[in-house]
């Protein structure tokens, strides 16, 4: 009688990060579409260095860049959200409950939408509406580079053996540096995207940069 070979069924259950792959691949496809179709096969150097008056299709490029930034940022920070507020968790349309990535994406998307709407109204209110299109054209370049860095951080965070608890403090340093750099980038950019008068610049930085970030922090982490 032949010996029966016994196999030990060891099932390894890895952390399921397939959703991260799908989101990041979607972000990359959006950028490929933007560069090849919207920007008419522009290379990276031409896209980043193009001048406003030589550009076209700025609005769709800005929308895609904002979407990718919101998605990649949500993927990165969602794992640090302590809890979903009860009034959000209790809202279950069609029996589905919002998870942390969904909650984070909604909050960050609302953050971008409301801040953009307020920035538009700000430029119109001070009589500087012509600068609005130059503003979001310049902002697109900044957020494009930021989103690429966020995608790299997402890959590192989910697919490399790092201490995620310790990494959180480094993310805070990173985003603090990004914020400070962004303020100076807007202040001293050659396109002069901020209002000329200093008190309007101060008002913009306080009300449309600092205050919204504090509210975003409160909604996500407090």
Regions found by a protein language model. Name each.
Residues 1-62, 86:
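N-terminal juxtamembrane cytosolic/stromal segments of multi-pass membrane proteins
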Residues 14-31, 95-111, 165-174:
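Alpha-helical transmembrane segments
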Residues 28-30, 64-80, 106-110, 114, ...:
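Hydrophobic alpha-helical transmembrane segments of multi-pass integral membrane proteins
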Residues 38-43, 73-89, 118:
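Membrane-helix interface motif
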Residues 38-52, 121-131, 188-192:
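Cytoplasmic membrane-interface regions of multi-pass membrane proteins
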Residues 87-158:
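Alpha-helical transmembrane segments with an aromatic anchor "belt"
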Residues 153-222:
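Terminal transmembrane helical module of multi-pass membrane proteins
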């Amino acid at each position: 009688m032949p010996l029966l070979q016994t196999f030990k069924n060891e099932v390894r259950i890895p952390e399921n990060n397939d959703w991260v792959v799908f989101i990041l691949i979607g972000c990359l496809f959006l950028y490929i579409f933007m560069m090849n179709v919207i920007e008419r096969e522009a290379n990276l150097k031409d896209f980043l260095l193009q001048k406003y008056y030589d550009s076209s299709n700025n609005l769709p490029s800005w929308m895609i860049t904002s979407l990718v930034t919101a998605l990649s940022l949500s993927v990165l920070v969602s794992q640090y959200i302590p809890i979903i507020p009860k009034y959000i968790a209790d809202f279950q349309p069609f029996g589905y409950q919002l998870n942390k990535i969904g909650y984070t994406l909604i909050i960050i998307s609302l953050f971008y939408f409301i801040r953009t709407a307020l920035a538009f109204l700000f430029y119109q209110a001070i009589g500087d509406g012509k600068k609005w299109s130059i503003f979001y054209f310049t902002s697109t370049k900044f957020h494009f580079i930021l989103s690429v860095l966020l995608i790299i951080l997402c890959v590192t965070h989910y697919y490399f053996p790092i201490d995620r608890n310790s990494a959180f403090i480094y993310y805070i340093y990173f985003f603090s540096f990004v914020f400070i750099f962004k303020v100076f980038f807007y202040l001293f950019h050659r396109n002069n995207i901020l209002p000329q008068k200093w008190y309007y610049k101060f008002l913009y930085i306080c009300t449309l940069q600092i205050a919204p970030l504090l509210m975003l922090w409160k909604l996500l982490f407090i």
